Amino acid sequence: MKESIMSFFNAPITNKVPSGVCSVAGLHAYISSDSHLKELTQRVRADTENDKAFRGKKQTLLPYVTPAGIFSYCREQCIMLPSGDFVIDIDHLASVEEAMMWRDRLFADEVLQPDLAFVSPGAKGVKLFVPYRLNLTDTLEHSFDNALHTAWDYLEWRHGLKADTANADMSRACFLAYDACLLYTSP
């Protein structure tokens, strides 16, 4: 396994210039142990019952990454280096416990083989960073789209889960949330 790297952006979401680059290993350490991220995640999750307040807090407080690679600016045409990963976002699960169960089950999936799996900012969802092969005879966009749609179809067929299709854009922001029990595949 290779170590994927991606752009890291400080909050708020209106900040489109990355503050740096991080690896999946660095994200593992940050998501599982950073006390400031833990406090921000708790503040965001305090408003999960009020969708407008939750969305506003998530967008103003939480940092985010672009799992598909390194970008000079958070826009698809500004990709500098692809990571070989894409994000799968499963939302609207019934409970935090169900989210943790799916995090663990999907991380163990032998077809998906995620590099990273954590409970999403809303606590009732899961985010997976899934590796894919870049095809030398295809464009980057085609390789990315093909892998993403294949994974979505597989998730629905194998697990009965619908992924959030808003993540079809390579530069799509993936908000980070504290998860002491996230799962990580070391290279």
Residue ranges and their predicted role:
Residues 119-125, 168-173:
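Short Gly/Ser/Thr- and Asp/Glu-enriched loop/turn motifs at secondary-structure junctions
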Residues 184-187:
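Conserved small/polar residues in nucleotide/adenosyl-binding loops
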Residues 140-178:
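Aromatic- and Lys/Arg-enriched surface recognition patch
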Residues 1-124, 132-147:
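Signature for HUH/AEP ssDNA processing cores
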